[in-house]
Swiss-Prot record:
The gene is xseB. Bidirectionally degrades single-stranded DNA into large acid-insoluble oligonucleotides, which are then degraded further into small acid-soluble oligonucleotides. GO terms for cellular component: cytosol; exodeoxyribonuclease VII complex. Heterooligomer composed of large and small subunits. InterPro entries: Exonuc_VII_S, Exonuc_VII_ssu_sf. Belongs to the XseB family. Gene3D superfamilies: Exonuclease VII, small subunit (1.10.287.1040). This is Exodeoxyribonuclease 7 small subunit. It holds the Pfam family Exonuc_VII_S. It comes from Rickettsia africae (strain ESF-5). SUPFAM superfamilies: XseB-like. Its main location: cytoplasm. GO terms for molecular function: exodeoxyribonuclease VII activity. It is an enzyme of class 3 (hydrolase).
Length: 80
């Protein structure tokens, strides 16, 4: 785990999600010190935001791809 104040821009969605899941497990166990738990929580928020951003980017790409030949756009609600 790196500094809780920053998040590497090149971290993949899968890596971020895996790390976020690990943080949740650690916090749920309640075996970390308060300071460590707060730092983990802070990192978790950064990871959550990163995952949401990646999902939004993917959704926008998919919407762009669904353009029809006549340049109309078909936007279908996607479940994420």
């Amino acid at each position: 785990m790196t500094n809780t104040k920053t998040l590497e821009a090149n971290i993949s969605f899968e890596e971020a999600l895996k790390e976020l899941e690990e943080i949740v497990k650690k916090i749920d166990k309640g075996q970390e010190s308060l300071e460590t738990a707060v730092n983990s929580f802070e990192r978790g928020i950064l990871l959550k935001n990163h995952c949401e951003k990646k999902l939004k980017e993917a959704r926008l790409k998919i919407e762009k791809i669904t353009k029809l030949a006549d340049s109309t756009v078909v936007l279908e609600e996607m479940e994420v």
